[in-house]
Amino acid sequence: LSLTPTPGVLHK
């Protein structure tokens, strides 16, 4: 998992 572009959005 990378850092999420926006809080609350999980971005693999």
From Swiss-Prot:
Q: What is its main location?
A: secreted
> Which organism does this record belong to?
Cycas revoluta
Q: Which UniProt keywords apply?
A: Cell wall, Secreted
Q: Does the keyword Secreted apply?
A: yes
Give the CC-aspect GO terms: extracellular region
Q: What is this protein called?
A: Unknown protein 2
Q: Record's superkingdom? A: Eukaryota
Q: Quote the subcellular location field of this record.
A: Secreted, Cell wall
